[in-house]
Amino acid sequence: MQLVSIFLFISFLFLLRKWKKYLNNSQTKKLPPGPWKLPFIGGMHHLAGGLPHRVLRDLAEKYGPLMHLQLGEVSAVVVTSPEMAKQVLKTHDIAFASRPKLLAMDIICYNRRDIAFSPYGDYWRQMRKICIMEVLSAKSVRSFSSIRHDEVVRLIDSIQPCFTSGELVNFTERIIWFTSSMTCRSAFGQVLKEQEVFIKLIREVISLAEGFDVADIFPSYKFLHGFGGAKQKLLNAHRKVDSIVEDVIKEHKKNLATRKSDDAIGGEDLVDALVRLMNDKSLQFPINNDNIKAVIIDLFAAGTETSSTTTVWAMAEMLKNPSVFAKAQAKVREAFRDKVTFDENDVEELKYLKLVIKETMRLHAPVPLLVPRECREETEINGYTIPVKTKVMVNVWALGRDPKYWDDAESFKPERFEQCSIDFIGNNFEYLPFGGGRRICPGISFGLANVYLPLAQLLYHFDWKLPTGMEPKDLDLTESAGITAARKGDLYLIATPHQP
């Protein structure tokens, strides 16, 4: 007991010293306004009991669109207006181009050797360029069209028997399986044998990567990092994921060794390309197994979670708004009335469906706080100082619901985009579902392709209804916690095959 008391006393003195240092620093710099703080934990108590993007939106209404928030020992700034977002993502983009350390990404992505969470620099540029060239470019995305077609056929075939048996369709589960299979075949060249386990592990990691864990708000207090159990869960998930991906890499190395040299580049998937580049002596940063694993996990997490989240939200919002659902389905069936099958080129003509997806991503940005940035150099914005190492969060969920920029902001109205030039590429700072600037998501084309085609096919081939006894007003649109804001709870529906 005496040893415990001594330990607690020493810890208290250490924390007190840190707190005094923070107070001295904050008094010498004009930080943005923010909510009141408590010793040691700062403003963490303001986030208790709510989803961070919602709580931070409410706080910003009181303290302003550039708000300071002390998260334990981490100084953070929250951006909640298009004007301030432009300052961070465009005007001072280079100053805010790096990423803060997050425990989940350090563990699961091999000390941030991925792309999304890698610090800004030459390594990030090299790996981003490789991934864009090999799998994320428009040309590469088009080359995967036959894979998407195959997976959509499998998706439709898996739903058909539910009508005969009277079983509800777990729409969420089917869409996650489609997007994960699509991503697997693009990255690995095949569906994983352990795909179900792999999906579960990646989703678990995503749920733990919110950035508000004890280790993320007290990074220098290593003795606290085990509290709450998140670190152990991440380590367990990492071991299992590492084993699965290691087997994939070994298989690709074996196949590459037996493949004819003149056929080495034709028909490559991402792992093939990365394995081949392991022997490229011209690379500034040589590629090893851990680099490949980190990039694979990155692509899989982003490619699966964001696309599936958007597709599920789109269906939920359409069923919540029956007139939108009826119009979207009618447009699809009218466009393909005389066709036995249709492909991605045909889907490009479905203008109303594109409006539905745009509106879905306005209300339900896949990553509501974007992936946080870190200030690389002291910067002044709107008369306030943003110190080096400040964590910067852009609340794109709040931007998409700001009544100053969106008429009837909380309502689902795809038609609002009809006479509007707003797009996904980060030039409109009131609408940033994929972020903006140097760290904009490089997989926009890949992600959207995995939403448009399956949603169009599902609207064409099935009549969708809520479970018996449930009205549109009863449909729950609550979000789950995590770095992504997926719908809380799986979406169960009745699917009746359509006979043209």
Swiss-Prot record:
Keyword Lipid biosynthesis: no
Phosphoprotein keyword on record: no
Name of a matching Pfam family: p450
Record's keyword terms, sorted: Heme, Iron, Metal-binding, Monooxygenase, Oxidoreductase
One annotated GO molecular function: iron ion binding
Listed cofactors: heme
Annotated residues for binding of heme: 441
Protein EC: 1.14.-.-
Record InterPro entries: CYP450_71D, Cyt_P450, Cyt_P450_CS, Cyt_P450_E_grp-I, Cyt_P450_sf
Family the entry assigns: Belongs to the cytochrome P450 family.
Record's protein name: Cytochrome P450 71D7
Organism of origin: Solanum chacoense (Chaco potato)
Lineage start: Eukaryota, Viridiplantae, Streptophyta, Embryophyta, Tracheophyta
Gene name per UniProt: CYP71D7
